[in-house]
Amino acid sequence: CLNFLERPTDGQVLIEGKDLGTLNEKELRKQRSDIAMIFQHFNLLMQKNVIDNICFPLQIQGVKKKEARAKARELLKTVGLEEKEKAYPAQLSGGQKQRVAIARALASNPKILLCDEATSALDPQTTASILELLKSINEQFQITIVIITHQMSVIREICNRVAIIEHGELVENGL
């Protein structure tokens, strides 16, 4: 519901003071372009190599191939995978796949990065490295990162504000 891919049955979703429920389709698409997502299972295109996976959202936006590849290479450095540019997802570890997914999410310069159980499929050491990367991205790009997780260790490690939602109800929030 945060990105309004699904409409909430009740309440409001406010992003930068805008109630997404009041926006028309064109305005909603524009607002969604400021929100990127990473998922538990990476959602990489298996038939595309790493650089093409990262370029994919830029291709959809009509960015020229040379410019898209330059941006993708810059993001590969950010996530520490510059040597994996030509690898395919099947050749990567889970942590490397998640780093590619993060780079792809950052390609369109979002204001908000929505992480839906982004570390739950990873081992503890890889989870720690992904959380460090997310902290670095938050500081470097000044992106708001929203983490959806059931892992309390993730919350303790990275979150500076917490909201607990149970059965669709906000039951607790704070610093």
Residue ranges and their predicted role:
Residues 173-174:
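ABC ATPase "signature
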Residues 1-141, 145-154, 158-159, 164:
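ABC family nucleotide-binding domain
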